[in-house]
Amino acid sequence: MKRNTEKFHFNSTTFMQLISLTIILVLIAPVMTTAQAGKANFAGDWTLNAEKSTQPPGGQGGAMRMGGGNFLVTQEANILTVVRTRTGQDGQPTTSTMKYTLDGKESVNTSPRGESKSVATWSADGKSLTIETSRTMDINGESRTMKSKEEWVLTDSKSLTVTIARKSPDGEVKAVNVYDKK
């Protein structure tokens, strides 16, 4: 009889531990799911839809200079990675990779045009992402700082709108680029 009691006691303790763990998981899981499910996922291979996009008038910035062109996005955990391949002035393709942390902390990216510092922040509802960037460049021996603000919004699962505003000593230029998911 003593043997059966010990066995029951062991099972009872194990059972209580399992119940406690289950209760904790039931309470934590919805919070974790809501935190992840509430944020837009921009991952995909995106192609510029020139017909739906709006570029600045004149020669102030073609689609390529205002963030246009095709790009690939991966969004894993707390990192948004944007890979763009463009044709350079020499006709050769060049690839640039920008990484942004999605927690409101500063990200630093380096390119042939200089170092950029960016902060990405989510809207309160998690449906849009704003990326504010500051880049200092040397142009013809003169140091210039350009600031940009991009707002990324998924209009549906196959369409991404990126609204861009760039400020420089020459003024502000705005563009709206619409992308279709491949």
Question: What are these model-predicted stretches?
Answer:
Residues 9-10, 18, 101, 180:
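Compositionally biased, intrinsically disordered low-complexity regions enriched in proline and serine
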Residues 10-12, 25, 94:
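Generic hydrophobic-segment detector
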